[in-house]
Structures are given as C-alpha cells and as structure tokens.
Regions:
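Charged docking surfaces used in two-component/phosphorelay signaling
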Residues: 69, 164-372
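N-terminal Rossmann-like NAD(P) cofactor-binding subdomain of oxidoreductases
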Residues: 1-217, 257-261, 328-329, 333-339, ...
Length: 372
C-alpha cells in the first residue's frame, strides 16, 4: 500500500485538503501518516475510527519511508527539508503548496484541468516535484482554460482582488477583528440615526485610522480599505505577486518564458476566502459571446459561465456566492471599445482555499496513485 505523509494538515490550506480528502474517500487504499513540526507523538486526526499518532516532521528517516509527501507547511519548511531528503537518497514524490520551489527547473506546477498533459509528461519523464501554483493565477486560468486550449490568448492584463485567506490564517482573523473593532465602537443610535450619514462616515473613517485598529499582520487597515501591494517590492514597479503572473502562467502551460505576456496589479481586499480578477485579454481573433461561453464551459466541469447582465452577475459572480464551492465563475465578458482590436474583458471569481490551494494537491495525489 502506498505510504503517504501529510504535513501542515492543521493549517488553513491543510485543513481544507484534509476535508476534501475525506469527502472524496481519498484515504481508502493509502497508508496515511500525519507529521507535525511541534507535536510529534501527540494525537493526530481520527479517520474511519482510527486515531493517528503524529510523527516528527523534522525526522528525515521517518519522512524517507513515505512514497508520497504532501506538505502545506510553508516555504521555510520546504527549503530546509526537501534538499535534506534528496541528500538522504529519498526517491519519492513531493507535492507542495508553498511557492519556494515553483520555479525550480525540477518542478511541475500542477493545475490538472488546465495542464494535465504537461503533468502526465512530467510523470513519464521522472519528475518527482509537483507544486501548486499561485492562487490568483490558478483561479484565473481555471476560468480561461477554454481560451487557452484553443490557443486564443495573445496577452493578458490581470487586476486581482485578493482575499485575506491568501495571506494566511492570522490575516483572516485580523480582518474579522478589524470589522469587530469598528462595530464595537458604534452604538445602535449612530447606525439608526435618520439624519445625515456624514457623522457616521467620519467616525468610521477615524476608527479605521485609529492606532487601536488591529494591523499587526497586514500592516495597514483592510476593513473599509484596500492594500495596493502584495508580496515584496522588486524595485521595478512590480510586486513579486505581479511578477508571478507571467512567470507562472507560462510555466503552467509549458510555454517558453514570455510566450503569453501577463502583467497587472495585485490588490488585497476585505474578502475572506475568494480571489477575483478583472482581466483584459487580447485574443488572436474575434470571438462572439456564444463562442466564448461554449469554449469556457466545455473546458472542464468546474467553470461556471455567468451571462453579462446585472442580475446574473450580482447573483452568481461574487465571493459571497462562490465561497466554499469548487466552481470558478467567469463573466462580464464584453468587447472593449479600443479601436477594432479583439480585446475583451472578463471577471473571474474562485475560492482561494480550494482550486487556489488544496484541490490541485489532492488531485495530484490521485494522479500519482493511479500511476505508481
């Protein structure tokens, strides 16, 4: 039976991965082992009535007994442990949620509804390192898979509106704490006063700027605001998150660097767990809305086309509607009034913790289980 080690299973992405594996009965037919960086010997999860005992996630010997390792423990863990495992002589498969090894020449970025052929080729070629992609990129590509398959995209400008969950569990808690801080400092009379709303607006603005506003993790208020920069400053006007757009898109698709130019801005918004992206596309030819709908909806089962009208968009193309769902919404398709070029706009919305993080890892595990 295939020995599968799971690390980081108590974190936000790891918890979603564990939930999805239980829902899909992925523990049937594998011998699962749960590892911990801090609680080795302690109690792990209970699955099918069996209480698992945690193993030491820093033990190279214990890890080396695994045929497949899935880690959601983060980049620092990956950078410390993966090279040590290889030096020890481990020949197993490493499936990773962290970004540390995404651009490594040994790695295949996994998003099988979009790049299954590349994944199969990598397995056939002996690749053992499989890494989940950047969440905003993977969710956008999930929506655009039909256009990608038809080789229609010339370039993309991607403006992302990224949720707190993309930054981590502490950031989700902080966003909720910011909301609580504002609400706790407003009285019912202030909220229900039928007079001018301006005093209420001014007070909320003061609360947002208050030095008591919890900002230890974000470094700035997000509730009632945005954070116009994600990840490090590359010094050329781009954030590292924006650089990932082109670099990872082309690698996911198995294309030479720069084949599809991608750029834009990555913005943090006050949403819990769904990323959205407003995408301007230059296509290689004109595409009608009917053809666009056919292309995207026939690409894979997890894309939901939303007609470009107000009622459908407000009802079905929002984080509130899509959160917790495997469906990636795509809509607001229209031709831009920019000369006569085939330039179009679309909006994608997807759950950052599912297709943006955990689901590609879970599916990669099953691809390997069916191959080894």
């Amino acid at each position: 039976m295939t020995q599968v080690g799971i690390i980081g299973w108590r974190g936000m992405v790891g918890s979603v991965l564990l939930q999805r594996m239980l829902e899909e009965n992925d523990f049937n037919g594998i011998s699962a082992h749960f590892f911990s960086t801090s609680s080795a010997g302690g109690h792990g999860p209970v699955i099918d009535g069996i209480r698992y005992t945690l193993k030491d996630a820093h033990s190279i010997e214990a890890l080396a007994e695994m045929d497949i390792i899935i880690t959601c423990q983060g980049g620092e863990y990956t950078k410390a442990i993966y090279p040590a495992l290889l030096e020890y002589g481990w020949k197993g498969y490493w499936i990773d949620a962290a970004s540390a090894l995404r651009m490594d020449e040994r790695a295949c970025i996994i998003l099988d509804p979009v790049n299954r052929k590349n994944i199969d080729r990598a397995v056939n070629d002996g690749i053992k390192l499989f890494v989940g992609g950047n969440c905003s990129i993977t969710l956008s590509l999930m929506g655009l898979a039909g256009l990608i398959n038809a080789d229609l995209i010339e370039w993309m400008s991607v403006m992302t509106y990224q949720s707190a969950s993309g930054a981590g569990a502490k950031h989700v808690r902080e966003l909720i704490a910011q909301s609580a801080y504002i609400s706790q400092n407003l009285s019912p009379d202030e909220l229900e006063n039928p007079g001018s709303v301006l005093p209420l607006v001014n007070k909320v603005s003061e609360l947002i700027r208050s030095d008591k506003m919890p900002i230890d993790n974000f470094g700035a208020p997000l509730m009632g605001s945005i954070i116009p920069w994600i990840d490090s400053d590359l010094g050329d006007g781009n954030s590292r998150e924006e650089w990932k757009g082109e670099a990872e898109t082309n690698k996911i698709l198995g294309l030479p660097v720069g084949t599809i130019p991608v750029n834009g801005l990555c913005i943090r918004v006050g949403v819990i767990r769904c990323h959205s992206a407003a995408i301007t596309l230059k296509l290689k030819r004109e595409v009608s809305e009917a053809e666009f709908e056919a292309l995207v909806t026939h690409s894979h089962p997890w894309v939901n086309y939303v007609p470009n009208n107000k009622e459908a968009s407000v009802a079905h193309l929002t984080p509130a509607h899509i959160s917790g769902s495997l469906q990636v919404g795509i809509g607001r398709f229209k031709k831009m009034a920019l000369n006569n070029d085939p330039i179009y706009s679309v909006l994608t919305v997807g759950d950052q913790l599912l297709w943006g993080a955990a689901e590609p890892l879970r599916r990669m595990l099953n691809i390997l289980l069916n191959r080894i």
